[in-house]
C-alpha cells in the first residue's frame, strides 16, 4: 500500500512531476473547468464576500472557545446514544478504530472519502489488522485500485484521464463486471461499473468509517456533504458507524451551516449545492446504524492553535479552491507536495500538523509557492495563505539556524572579509573574471553550481567579466588618471569623494558585521515576539481538551461578533444581531418558479399538481419512468397514492431490511421543505418521509412538495428545521465529476428523481 512517507522534498519532487506532460494536461483542463464554474457562480451570488467574512468569523469564534465546544459536543453526542473517543495523535485514533472493528468481528469496512482518515493512515492500520478496506468514493476507488496516491482534496484522481481510468478498471475489477473490457472510456460507463462493483459491498457491510465536514456542538450532529450517494450508503446501512473527525471541524450552532453550505460546494466544484448533505446525531430506532462512535482527533491541531498566526489554517473547510487557482499546483500536481494535503493549504497545514522540525518534506512546503496571492483571493474562509507561508518560512529558517548553519556563518564571515578590503575585493574580481571567462566562454551560464543552483535552474546567470570595471578605468585613463570619486565638478565635491573613498573599507566592515549580527539576532529570537516551535508540546499531562485549553491559555483569541450581512440573515435573535441585508433574495411569490428552475438544472424533473390531483400526478411520473413496485412511508397521506395503473404499492413498515428496499423500483415520500435558491428538497424524518434508506435505495425517488413548503434561501430553511433532527438534503440525482470533471448522473443514489409540486 503506497503512502507519502517515501516522498522527496518539494524541490526535487517538482522536477520529476514537471516532466509528466500528460498529468500536466489533465490538471490544466480540470482546474480550468472548476475555475470557470466557480467564477460564474460567484458572479451570481451578490453576497459572496459577506458570506466569506461571516465564515471566517464563525471559525475564529469556534477556535477561540474550542475547549468548551468540544465538551458540549461530547455531551450532546452521548445524550443521543453515541460514544465519543478523544485521540491525541494518529496512533491513538487508529487503535480506537481498529479496536471497534475487531470487537465486532468485521473482516471488511466500507469508507466514505475522508481527508482525516487519510492523514492518520487509517487504511494501513486496518490492513495490518487483517481488515479489508473498501473505498467507496469513485475517485478514491480509482486511486485504490490503481495503487496510486490522491493528488487533490476534492477530486483525488484529478491527475488521471478517462483512458487511464478505463485501464485501471479493466485490470483490477472482477471479470463479471468488466467482461471482455469496456467498449468505451465514456465516464458514464465507468461510473456504472463502479456502482455495480460496490453495490453488494454496501448492502452486506457491517461497519462503516466516515469523516465529517462539520460537527455541530449545539446538537451533537455530524454533517457530511457529498455527491455520489456513497456517503449516504455508509452513514445509513451498516450496523456500526465510526466517524473520525478533526477537532477543527467543530462549529458552535446549527444556524452556522447557513453560511458554510452556501460556500462549500461553490468553492469546491462550482455548484450551488452538492447533491447530498446528510446530518445525523447518535443512533435512531430503525433509521441508520445501531451503534455510533465519534473519534475526535487532535494530531497537531492543539499545537497549531498556540500559534497566533499559523492557527488561521484551522479555519480550512477542505474545499480545495486554493488548489484550483494555484499556478504551482497546476504544473506539478498534488503528489509533489508529499502529503495528503496538497497545494497552498497543504503547504501551511502539513508542517504545522506534523510537528516534526527535521522532516525535509514538511520543511520544504512553505517554500513551494510564488506568493502570488491567488489562493487568498478565493479562500471561502479568508485564510491569508501567503502570510502564513512567509511566517512558516521564517520559522523554518529559525529552526535551521538553531541546528547550526556553519555554511551560512562562514559565507557571511568571508563576505565581511572581502568587502572590508579594496585590495581583496579587487583580487576577487580578477580571479572570478578569469575563471568565469575560462569556464563559460559564452558569457552566460545555466550551470547549477553551489548556492546559485536554484537561481540558475530557471534563469541565465551573468558571468563575471574578464576585465573588472576598475581595471578598465585604469586602462582607459592610465595609472595617473583621476580617481573615480574625483570626477566631481568642484574642489569641494572632490574632497568629499576622497573622504568617501577612504571610508569605504570601514563601511564594508560595518556591513559585514551587520550581516552577522542580523543572523545571530534571528537565531536567538531577539525580537521579543513569542514564536511557538513546531515541537512545542503542552507542559502538563492531559487529554485533547486539556491540550486545547492550555493552548488557548497561552495564546488566547479575543471574542468577536459575527457579522451577518448576507442575504436572509438577521432572524436568529440577539446572538446573531446584524443590520438588515442589502442582498435580499426575491420575495416568496417568485420562490416557486426559482425552485423549479434550479431543481431541473441538476437533472431532476418537476410535475405540477393541485391538492386533488396529487395521486394522478404521482401515477403519471411512475408510469413515465416504468416504475412498478413502489414503497412508501407508513404515514404517507392516502390521497397521494396512485389509484390507477399497474402498480404494486406497499408501506415501508411491512418491508424488511435494506436489502429488501434495494429490490423496489421506486419510493414516494413527502418532505420537510424545499429551498428555491439552491433547488434543494429537505427530508427530516417528519410525517410521510420514512427512514433515510427509503429515499436512497430504490432507483427512482418521487418527492411530493407542497407550495407552502418552498422557502427562498438557506437562512429561511435553517430557521424552520429542527437542529436535533436527522436530515437529508437532496439537490438533484446522485452525481459525480471524478472523471475529467464530466458530470455523470446516477452513481450510488437514485438515478431518477422527480418532484410533484402541489400548488396552493
Predicted region positions:
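The feature marks the mature, well-folded catalytic cores of soluble enzymes
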Residues: 1-309, 505-508, 512-760
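Short, contiguous, pocket-lining structural segments
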Residues: 249, 314-318
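Ferredoxin-type iron-sulfur electron-transfer modules in oxidoreductases and energy-metabolism complexes
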Residues: 287-313, 324, 328-457, 493, ...
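Generic N-terminal simple sequence motifs
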Residues: 447, 458-461, 487, 501, ...
Amino acid at each position: 500500500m503506497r503512502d507519502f512517507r517515501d516522498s522527496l522534498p518539494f524541490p526535487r519532487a517538482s522536477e520529476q512531476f514537471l516532466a509528466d506532460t500528460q498529468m500536466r494536461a489533465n490538471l490544466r483542463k480540470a482546474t480550468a473547468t472548476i475555475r470557470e464554474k466557480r467564477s460564474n457562480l460567484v458572479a451570481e451570488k451578490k453576497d459572496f464576500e459577506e458570506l466569506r467574512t461571516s465564515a471566517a468569523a464563525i471559525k475564529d469564534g469556534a477556535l477561540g472557545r474550542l475547549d468548551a465546544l468540544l465538551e458540549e459536543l461530547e455531551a450532546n453526542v452521548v445524550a443521543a446514544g453515541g460514544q465519543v473517543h478523544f485521540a491525541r495523535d494518529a496512533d491513538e485514533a487508529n487503535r480506537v478504530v481498529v479496536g471497534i472493528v475487531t470487537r465486532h468481528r468485521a473482516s471488511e469496512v466500507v469508507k466514505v472519502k475522508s481527508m482525516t482518515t487519510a492523514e492518520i493512515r487509517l487504511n494501513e492500520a486496518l490492513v495490518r489488522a487483517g481488515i479489508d478496506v473498501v473505498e467507496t468514493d469513485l475517485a478514491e476507488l480509482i486511486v485504490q485500485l490503481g495503487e496510486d496516491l490522491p493528488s487533490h482534496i476534492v477530486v483525488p484522481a484529478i491527475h488521471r484521464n478517462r483512458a487511464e481510468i478505463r485501464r485501471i478498471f479493466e485490470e483490477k475489477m472482477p471479470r463479471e463486471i468488466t467482461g471482455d473490457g469496456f467498449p468505451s472510456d465514456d465516464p458514464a460507463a465507468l461510473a456504472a461499473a463502479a456502482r455495480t462493483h460496490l453495490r453488494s459491498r454496501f448492502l452486506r457491510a457491517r461497519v462503516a468509517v466516515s469523516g465529517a465536514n462539520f460537527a455541530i456542538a449545539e446538537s451533537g450532529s455530524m454533517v457530511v456533504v457529498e455527491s455520489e450517494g456513497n456517503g449516504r450508503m455508509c452513514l445509513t446501512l451498516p450496523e456500526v458507524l465510526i466517524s473520525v473527525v478533526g477537532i477543527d471541524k467543530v462549529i458552535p450552532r446549527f444556524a452556522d451551516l447557513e453560511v458554510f453550505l452556501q460556500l462549500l460546494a461553490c468553492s469546491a466544484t462550482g455548484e450551488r449545492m452538492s447533491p447530498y448533505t446528510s446530518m445525523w446525531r447518535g443512533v435512531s430506532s430503525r433509521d441508520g446504524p445501531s451503534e455510533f462512535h465519534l473519534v475526535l482527533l487532535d494530531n497537531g491541531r492543539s499545537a497549531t492553535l498556540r500559534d497566533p498566526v499559523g492557527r488561521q489554517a484551522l479555519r480550512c473547510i477542505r474545499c480545495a479552491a486554493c488548489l484550483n487557482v494555484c499556478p504551482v499546483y497546476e504544473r506539478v500536481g498534488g503528489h509533489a507536495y508529499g502529503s495528503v494535503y496538497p497545494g497552498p493549504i497543504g503547504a501551511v497545514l502539513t508542517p504545522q500538523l506534523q510537528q516534526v522540525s527535521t522532516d525535509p518534506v514538511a520543511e520544504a512546503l512553505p517554500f513551494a509557492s510564488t506568493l502570488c496571492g491567488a489562493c487568498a483571493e478565493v479562500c471561502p474562509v479568508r485564510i491569508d495563505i501567503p502570510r502564513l507561508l512567509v511566517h512558516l518560512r521564517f520559522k523554518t529558517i529559525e529552526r535551521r539556524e538553531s541546528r547550526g548553519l556553519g555554511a551560512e556563518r562562514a559565507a557571511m564571515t568571508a563576505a565581511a572579509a572581502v568587502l572590508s578590503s579594496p585590495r581583496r575585493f579587487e583580487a576577487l574580481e580578477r580571479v572570478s573574471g578569469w575563471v568565469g571567462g575560462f569556464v563559460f566562454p559564452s558569457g552566460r551560464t545555466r550551470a547549477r553550481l553551489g548556492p546559485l543552483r536554484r537561481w540558475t535552474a530557471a534563469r541565465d546567470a551573468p558571468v563575471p567579466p574578464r576585465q573588472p570595471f576598475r581595471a578598465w578605468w585604469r586602462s582607459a585613463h592610465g595609472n595617473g588618471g583621476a580617481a573615480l570619486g574625483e570626477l566631481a565638478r568642484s574642489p569641494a565635491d572632490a574632497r568629499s569623494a576622497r573622504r568617501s573613498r577612504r571610508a569605504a573599507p570601514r563601511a564594508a566592515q560595518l556591513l559585514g558585521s551587520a550581516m552577522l549580527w542580523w543572523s545571530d539576532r534571528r537565531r536567538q529570537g531577539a525580537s521579543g515576539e513569542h514564536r511557538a516551535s513546531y515541537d512545542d508540546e503542552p507542559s502538563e499531562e492531559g487529554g485533547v481538551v486539556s491540550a486545547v485549553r492550555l493552548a488557548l491559555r497561552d495564546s488566547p483569541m479575543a471574542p468577536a461578533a459575527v457579522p451577518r450581512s448576507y442575504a436572509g440573515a438577521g432572524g436568529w435573535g440577539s446572538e446573531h444581531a446584524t443590520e438588515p441585508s442589502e442582498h435580499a433574495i426575491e420575495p416568496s411569490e417568485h420562490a416557486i418558479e426559482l425552485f423549479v428552475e434550479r431543481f431541473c438544472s441538476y437533472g431532476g424533473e418537476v410535475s405540477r399538481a393541485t391538492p386533488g390531483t396529487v395521486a394522478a400526478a404521482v401515477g403519471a411520473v411512475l408510469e413515465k419512468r416504468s416504475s412498478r413496485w413502489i414503497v412508501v412511508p407508513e404515514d404517507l397521506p392516502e390521497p397521494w397514492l396512485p389509484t390507477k395503473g399497474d402498480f404494486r404499492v406497499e408501506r415501508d413498515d411491512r418491508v424488511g431490511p435494506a436489502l429488501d428496499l434495494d429490490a423496489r423500483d421506486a419510493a414516494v415520500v413527502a418532505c420537510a421543505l424545499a429551498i428555491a435558491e439552491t433547488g434543494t428538497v429537505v427530508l427530516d424524518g417528519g410525517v410521510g418521509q420514512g427512514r433515510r434508506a427509503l429515499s436512497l435505495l430504490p432507483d427512482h425517488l418521487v418527492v411530493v412538495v407542497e407550495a407552502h413548503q418552498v422557502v427562498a434561501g438557506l437562512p429561511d430553511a435553517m430557521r424552520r428545521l429542527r437542529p436535533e433532527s436527522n436530515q437529508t438534503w437532496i439537490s438533484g440525482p446522485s452525481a459525480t465529476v471524478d472523471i475529467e470533471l464530466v458530470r455523470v448522473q446516477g452513481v450510488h443514489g437514485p438515478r431518477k428523481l422527480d418532484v410533484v409540486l402541489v400548488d396552493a
